[in-house]
Design a protein with these regions (language model features):
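Canonical leucine-rich repeat
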Residues: 1, 22, 46, 71-72, ...
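Leucine-rich repeat
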Residues: 4-8, 28-32, 52-57, 82-86, ...
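Conserved hydrophobic position(s) of the canonical leucine-rich repeat
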Residues: 9, 19, 32-33, 43, ...
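Conserved hydrophobic beta-strand positions in leucine-rich repeat
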Residues: 10-14, 34-38, 58-63, 88-92, ...
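Consensus "Asn ladder" position of solenoid repeat domains
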Residues: 14-17, 41, 66, 95, ...
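Leucine-rich solenoid repeat scaffolds
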Residues: 36, 61, 168-217
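Acidic/polar low-complexity surface segments
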Residues: 66-78, 131-135
Length: 217
């Protein structure tokens, strides 16, 4: 049963339970929230209990070790009804996400770090981080992206500096790239890019070419 949005919490830890769903009117949050924990549960969708338009931005929200994406979708409602997440760091690692959670960015979520390691993504197509024309409101805030331990074979042009001008750290290690994904390399703020251990389904090392001019990026 929900507390209701009249109840405003400063902290919430629901880790290590058997929770399958969190209703939209579960509760509200104060402007002093640092971190919220929903890890190690059975959530199939990203809960719609936040609001990206809030003037208050929480420190972090952790949805790791759930079943998000297992039904083929990341959210249970329509995009018109989804409100995003007003948090700087969003952790979605160890789920069953097959499609990049574009919903978070389309709603203007002010995310600076997104952790999507250990999921089931094979590609991140164009218009996952931006619409066909222009950019979403707050995608430029994204500085750190963790995509390790997926099954990615390519990145789209969404990962260029025109969409992510402040990207500083990105890790695509333990994926399936056979060619170097150069898109993030034109970010003037990029400090670290990890691409270790690229193998195919049989375990063969498949990344063999070093991109020309990478030392001058």
């Amino acid at each position: 049963e929900a507390f209701g949005t009249n109840v405003k919490l400063t902290d919430l830890k629901l880790d290590y339970n058997q929770i399958e769903e969190i209703p939209e009117d579960f509760c509200a949050f104060t402007d002093q929230v640092e971190g919220l924990g929903f890890s190690h549960n059975k959530l199939k969708y990203i809960p719609n209990i936040f609001n990206a338009k809030s003037v208050y931005v929480m420190g972090s929200v952790d949805f790791s070790y759930n079943k998000i994406g297992s039904e083929g979708r990341n959210i249970s409602c329509s995009m018109d009804d989804y409100k995003g997440i007003n948090a700087s760091t969003v952790t979605l690692s160890y789920n069953e996400i097959q499609k990049f959670p574009s919903e978070l960015f389309a709603t203007g979520s002010p995310i600076s770090t997104i952790i999507l390691s250990n999921n089931l993504m094979t590609s991140i197509p164009e218009n996952s981080l931006k619409p066909k024309d222009g950019n979403y409101k707050n995608t430029y805030l994204l500085t750190t992206i963790d995509l390790r331990f997926n099954k990615l074979t390519s990145l789209s042009d969404d990962f260029r500096a025109t969409t992510l001008p402040y990207l500083s750290n990105m890790d695509v290690s333990y994926n399936c790239f056979s060619s170097f994904p150069t898109q993030p390399l034109n970010s003037s703020q990029l400090k670290a890019f990890g691409i270790r251990h690229q193998r195919d389904a049989e375990g063969n090392r498949i990344l063999r070419q070093w991109p020309t001019g990478i030392t001058t990026c």
